[in-house]
């Protein structure tokens, strides 16, 4: 997908953009259905477990976060009663048929847990160990559903215009990443 200023301005304004029919002609429900079908396809894999988040409290996220990790504890460690899970975060944009992925870790304990957020610098990085097959499977399924998988080369670039983006994830001057993947509490 070619990233134009028109597309960036639309997604910053909260409007759908892109050539995929769900985004070009569809309503919010069609876009949600498209993302749901994509996640369902990912969930069918025997190689990964998927946990999804599409909101964070009372805020708004311009993307759905899918955390993918190996089943049966194969990407987990337990230290001092806390479970640490290595995986791949996949962000599916709700405003354009674009997605990103990169290394993510989560922790869980009896008192709660923690996780982070991807930034433009984290893209196309993967956890240590054997993840190539899983990465390839995720990529294939995302591309089958019409998502363009963007990387740091495209998304680390600054916006070519001044924009106001309500986000807790970045500060001005904003990057192309911030236009597609923003969250505000």
How would you describe each model-predicted region?
Residues 2-144, 149:
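Extended, charge-biased low-complexity segments
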Residues 137-185:
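Acidic, proline/glycine-rich low-complexity IDRs
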């Amino acid at each position: 997908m070619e990233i134009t200023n028109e597309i960036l301005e639309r997604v910053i304004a909260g409007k759908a953009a892109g050539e995929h029919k769900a985004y070009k002609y569809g309503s919010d429900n069609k876009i949600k259905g498209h993302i749901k079908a994509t996640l369902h396809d990912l969930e069918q894999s025997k190689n990964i477990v998927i946990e999804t988040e599409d909101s964070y409290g009372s805020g708004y996220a311009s993307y759905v976060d899918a955390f993918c990790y190996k089943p049966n504890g194969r990407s987990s460690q337990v230290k001092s009663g806390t479970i640490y899970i290595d995986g791949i975060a996949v962000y599916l944009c709700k405003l354009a048929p674009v997605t990103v992925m990169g290394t993510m870790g989560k922790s869980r304990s009896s008192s709660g847990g923690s996780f982070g957020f991807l930034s433009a610098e984290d893209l196309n990085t993967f956890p240590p160990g054997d993840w190539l097959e899983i990465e390839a499977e995720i990529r294939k399924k995302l591309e089958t559903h019409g998502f363009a998988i963007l990387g740091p080369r495209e998304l680390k670039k600054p916006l070519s215009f001044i924009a106001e983006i309500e986000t807790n994830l970045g500060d001005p001057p904003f990057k192309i990443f911030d236009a597609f993947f923003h969250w505000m509490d």
